[in-house]
A protein has these predicted regions:
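Hydrophobic C-terminal alpha-helix "anchor/cap" residues
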Residues: 40-44, 52, 200
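Hydrophobic alpha-helical segments and helix pairs
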Residues: 119-149
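Hydrophobic/anchoring residues in structured secondary elements
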Residues: 51-54, 128
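A short, charged helix-loop
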Residues: 138-169
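Short aromatic-enriched loop/helix-cap "lid" or pocket-rim segments at secondary-structure transitions
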Residues: 64-67, 138-139
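Conserved nucleotidyltransferase catalytic core and NTase-mimicking acidic/glycine-rich helix/loop elements
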Residues: 2-4, 11-18, 158-297
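Metal-dependent nucleotidyltransferase catalytic core
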Residues: 18-47, 58-60, 66, 73-126
Length: 297
C-alpha cells in the first residue's frame, strides 16, 4: 500500500493539508516510512481497531534516523478487553517484522506496547486507546486512518493537555531527595549517587527549565537542541565515578535548582524553609566529613 494515496486511510487528498502531510511522510527515513506503509495496509483488517494516528516527533516534523514511532491505535469500546489480550499478536499482524514487545507499566501506561521491529531495527510504541478515552491526551497526533471520522470526533471532545512541571510539587520533594543522595555519596554508593543525580536532572532541573522557556518536553529529552545553554549548565551536575566529583555535582544541582526556582517564582526573595536550611547545611558539611576540605586548593 502506498502511504500517500490509499483509499483505506482517512486523508482526503484534495484537502489543503494533504500535500504537506504527503511531503512529511515522503521525507521520513526509509525504515520509518516502510513500517508505516505496512501498518496502514494491515490495520484495516484488524477487527476492533478503528483508527491509527502518529504522534511524538512526527507532529513537529522532527523524525530522524534515530527516532522511534509513536502510534495510537483507536479501539472500539466493545472490543477493548479482547484487543488488550491480543496486543502482541496485533503488533505482529501490523508488521510481520515484529521481534518483541512489552507493556508500559514502567512508565505508568499499561495500554502501551513497547515494540522492536526489524531488521532494520526500529523502536515503535503502540498505544491502544479506547474511543471512550481517546480525548484524554497530551498532544494532537496526526490521524492516518480512521473509520467514519471516529477518532477525529473523539479528539474534538477536548483539547490536549500536556502535563507541565509543578514548581510547588518539586519544592516539596527536592530537599528530601538531595539529602538522600548526599547520604549515598557519604556511604560510598557512588553509582547510586550517580543515578540520583540523573533523577534530579530528569524530574526537577530540566522540567523547570523547560517550563521557564515555555517548551513542552519530558525529562531531559532533546534538551541539547532545545535549551543548549542550559544543557551546558547541566554538565556540572553529571558527576564522575568518585566521591569528590559526586559532591561537586550535587552542590551544582542545588545551585542550579535554586536559580530555576527563583525564576519560576518570578521573584528573588524566596524564603528558605526549615528543611532547605537543614539540608543545605548537611550538604555543605559533606566535604569536611569526607576529608575533601582541600579539594579547591
Amino acid at each position: 500500500m502506498d502511504i500517500e494515496g490509499s483509499p483505506a486511510h482517512s486523508i482526503e487528498l484534495d484537502a489543503p493539508e494533504s500535500p504537506r502531510l504527503r511531503g512529511r511522510l515522503r521525507s521520513l527515513p526509509a525504515r520509518h516510512r516502510g513500517c508505516l506503509e505496512r501498518m496502514l495496509a494491515a490495520v484495516v483488517e484488524v477487527d476492533g481497531v478503528v483508527g491509527l494516528a502518529v504522534g511524538g516527533s512526527f507532529i513537529a516534523g522532527e523524525i530522524d534516523e534515530f527516532s522511534d514511532l509513536d502510534l495510537v491505535l483507536a479501539v472500539e469500546p466493545g472490543a477493548w478487553p479482547e484487543i488488550l489480550d491480543r496486543r502482541q499478536a496485533i503488533a505482529a499482524e501490523l508488521d510481520p517484522s515484529f521481534l518483541a514487545g512489552f507493556t508500559g507499566e514502567h512508565v505508568g501506561e499499561p495500554r502501551l506496547l513497547v515494540c522492536l521491529y526489524g531488521p532494520p531495527l526500529l523502536h515503535v510504541d503502540l498505544k491502544f486507546v479506547s474511543l471512550d478515552d481517546a480525548h484524554e491526551r497530551v498532544e494532537d497526533p496526526v490521524i492516518l486512518w480512521e473509520v467514519d471520522g471516529c477518532l477525529s470526533a473523539a479528539f474534538a471532545r477536548a483539547a490536549p493537555c500536556y502535563p507541565a512541571a509543578d514548581p510547588d510539587w518539586i519544592e516539596a520533594r527536592f530537599w528530601i531527595w538531595a539529602h538522600y543522595f548526599a547520604d549515598k555519596i557519604e556511604r560510598g554508593e557512588i553509582f547510586e549517587a550517580l543515578d540520583g543525580l540523573t533523577f534530579l536532572r530528569a524530574v526537577a532541573l530540566a522540567p523547570l527549565a523547560f517550563l521557564g522557556a515555555g517548551v513542552e518536553a519530558t525529562g531531559v529529552r532533546r534538551i541539547e537542541d532545545r535549551l543548549p545553554a542550559f544543557a551546558t549548565d547541566l554538565e556540572r551536575t553529571v558527576g564522575g565515578v568518585n566521591t569528590a566529583a559526586c559532591v561537586a555535582a550535587l552542590e551544582s544541582a542545588i545551585e542550579l535548582y535554586t536559580e530555576l526556582r527563583k525564576a519560576a517564582a518570578a521573584r528573588s526573595d524566596v524564603e528558605a524553609s526549615p528543611v532547605e536550611r537543614e539540608v543545605r547545611a548537611y550538604v555543605e558539611g559533606l566535604p569536611g566529613r569526607l576529608g575533601l576540605s582541600d579539594r579547591g586548593a
